From Swiss-Prot:
Its main location: nucleus. It comes from Arabidopsis thaliana (Mouse-ear cress). It is found in: Nucleus. The gene is PTD. The keyword Glycosyltransferase does not apply. Keywords: DNA recombination, Endonuclease, Hydrolase, Meiosis, Nuclease, Nucleus. This is Protein PARTING DANCERS. It is an enzyme of class 3 (hydrolase). Required for chromosome segregation during meiosis. During diakinesis and prometaphase I, essential for the formation of class I meiotic crossovers and homologous recombination. It holds the Pfam family HHH_5.
Amino acid sequence: MATAGSSYSVSTDHQVSSPLVNLGNVAGVCIMSNAWKVEQEPSLINFISAFLSANSFRLNFVSIPPDLIFNCGGVSIAFVFVTKWDFSNVASIFSRVKRLKGQFAQLYVVATLSTKEQSDSFMRSYFQYEMEFGKPAFVQVTDAEMGFEKIVKIAHSRGVCKQQKVASKLKVERKRTVQDTNIFIRFVTSIPNINKHDANTLYQAIGSIEAIAKASKEDILANTDLSSKKADTLTRFFQDPEFYLSPKFN
C-alpha cells in the first residue's frame, strides 16, 4: 500500500555492501510483506536478498501489515518502506503510518525522496497530516538501496542494544533529544514572527541553530516553506547586529 505504483531502477554504482561492522553472533530475521514484495521490481528484491545474506539475516515472506519486520537480538522493529514517493498517494501513506503506529511500539518510516519536488511534498504532507515529531521516526533517503541498508543498520543497532542491556541508556538519550528539540523550538519561536510550525520546518530541513545562523535567505527559501519575509527576518536576526541588538516592541 505504501508503495502503490512504485518502481525501481537499478543503480549501476551500487553494489551489495560488505557485512555490518561488529555484527558478531547476532541472529536476525527479516520478514517481508507478500503484498509489498509483488509491488517491487525483481532487481530490488534480489538486492535485498543478497544484502541480507551478506549480513547473516534470514529472509521470510509473510502476509503482515507493515512492509518489513526485523527480529534482531530479541527486538522486533517494523518498517514502512516507501520506495517511490507517489504524489497522488500521499494521503494513504500517512493514514497507514498513523494506523501502524498504534500497532507497533517500534516503527520507522523510510521514504525514498530523490528530487527536491518529492522532498518538498514530504515536508508539506508531514505537517498537513499532523504527524507527531519522532513518532514514528522518518528516515529520508535518495534511493531504495540506500534505504534498505539504513533499515538493516537500524534493526541491527536495536538488536545489539538489547543484547548489551543498554535500553536505559537509549531512554536517557531519547529524553535528551526531546529536550534539545524543545530548547530549539523555544529559542527559534522567540524570534519575531516565527511560529512553532516554522521552527519544526527549520529543524527538519536545516537542523541546528548554528546551521540556521549560517544559512542565507536563499538557503532558507530553497529548503523550507517559510515566506520571503520570514526568511529575511531569520537572516537579519542572526547576521545583522543592528537588527538583533535593537529593542523589539509591539
